[in-house]
Amino acid sequence: MQALEGIKVVDLSRALSGPFCSMVLADLGADVIKVESGPHGDMSRAWGPFDRGVSTYYLSCNRNKRGICVDFRQPAGLDVVRRLVAQADVVIENFKAGTMDAMGLGYAALSARDPRLVMGSVTAFGPRGPLRDWPGFDQIAQGYAGLMSLTGFPDGEPTRTGTAIGDLSSGMWVATGVMAALFERERTGRGQHVGTSLLESLVALLSVHGQRYLSLGDVPRRTGNAHAVIAPYGVFETADGPLNLAPITSDMWLRLCQLLDLPELPDDPRFATNDARVAHRDALKALLESRLRTRGKREWTQRFVDAGLPAGPINTLDEVFDDPQLAHCGLVEPVAHPTLGTLRQVVTPLGGMGDDVPAPRTRHAPPLLGEHTVDVLREAGYDDDAIDALLAGRTIFQADAVAEAVQ
């Protein structure tokens, strides 16, 4: 039995932050009902690249859910959503602040009917304050939170991270908050509304950079692939490409000098202390690379690791997914998809550390648009006549009818 088995989640979110949150809950055993607005569904379904017509963006964050398609614009459609929510333990949403209240689905209204309900929300800038009504996506928040000012090279422009870290981190924060709220509900019998924003999530991830400013008033700047306060640390060129090297202690620094046959460096005043090495990092990098360029990155990596020095290659994604370590981690699992056949996916990285601890597992693929509409409505208490009427009125959509409705 998985930790969240028996917990029912109604996921009203779209795009990435909310769906990622609910996928984490689904991977841990929750029964997640993904409710998409008909007839077109989650906006991410239109975002490429596509695998035989299916968005890989959508596939990345909707595993282990059952999917229904409802026209929210119709009163009967909202009634369907309200009935599903009334039977749920958790509701996830990432609408603009105030939208849920306007639909009659705000936490105050829902919790008045069911005090045990837990709601998890993600907004762009928070539910209060002067920016509560601002629209925002990941890159907008990365810039506003200062993250882009820290990312990139000193002589280059501010740079976004290579993945949607604001969306993903806010999803993880809310998943954590939902689980804490469910645990608290066991003690008090009451649910609660937990939430975060892209802005808050990214500011929380500033970590030492944020503390440096709050404590010292220093405004950190971009340092490229170098560490702001440790040297040597970062990317170094070898004979056949770059590798990462991070000898962060004094003992590691001495071992590095011995391994590279540079015994004079520790006595050089420019490199005798970490602060001195940071001040002269460019000169130090040139000296280290003069040795590193004599061998390839794989050979150097093995030599460094054998000497107890943290190092590793800088892989492309084909190298990542072909790496045997990934297979040992069990991070990629196959799942049967209704139209794509066998689909490989990266799973939630919470493998059990013992045989008696169940790891998250893939139960079913990301749903087709409206794949489980009829089944879910039957479970919710709708009889076949009512379901047929909703289908005929284009209030709900079942998978085999969605393509026709969109045309």
Which functions belong to the PLM regions below?
Residues M1-R187, L368, V374-Q407:
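N-terminal helix-loop segment corresponding to the beta1-alpha1 unit
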Residues P39, F125-G126, L198-V203, D240-P242, ...:
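Glycine-rich beta-alpha junction loops
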Residues Y58, T223-A228, Y233-G234, L340-V347, ...:
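Short Gly/Pro-enriched turn/cap motifs at secondary-structure boundaries
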Residues P127, D155-I165, E186-L202, R221-A228, ...:
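Conserved Rossmann-fold dehydrogenase catalytic segment
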Residues G171-G191, A204-L216, C257-E264:
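Oxidoreductase and adenylate-handling cofactor-binding alpha/beta cores
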Residues A231-A307, A311:
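Aromatic-enriched alpha-helical interface/lid elements that frame and gate functional surfaces
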Residues V305-C329:
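Conserved PLP cofactor-binding pocket of PLP-dependent enzymes
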Residues A336-A389:
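Flexible, small-/acidic-enriched active-site or ligand-binding loops
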